[in-house]
């Protein structure tokens, strides 16, 4: 099942930061902050990479899942908690902004 366009718009509204964009990829979406990929939205569920910074914010008890077959394990972000979602996006951006794209 692909992500609904209304859901990705809701995700962007919840994050409520300037320079947020999204791009459709294989029926699902990648969310970018200042052109840096920060979130993956698959099947109307928001996934964030497991990093030291995201572990500190979300905690070890955060729900985890696989966004698609063959993917690495990710945290499942509670997008209804807009403050936490915003902090998570900024944290991922700060640790990824200087890394070159593959």
Per-segment meaning from a language model:
Residues 1-102:
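Charge-dense, helix-prone N-terminal extensions
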């Amino acid at each position: 099942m692909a992500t609904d366009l209304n859901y990705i718009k809701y995700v962007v509204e919840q994050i409520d930061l300037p320079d947020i964009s999204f791009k459709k990829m294989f029926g699902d979406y990648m969310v970018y902050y200042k052109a840096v990929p920060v979130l993956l939205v698959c099947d109307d569920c928001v996934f964030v990479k497991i990093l030291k910074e995201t572990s500190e914010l979300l905690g070890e008890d955060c729900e985890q899942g696989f966004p698609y077959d063959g993917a690495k394990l990710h945290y499942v972000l509670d997008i209804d908690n807009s403050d936490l979602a915003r902090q998570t996006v900024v944290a991922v951006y700060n640790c990824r902004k200087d890394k070159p794209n593959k």
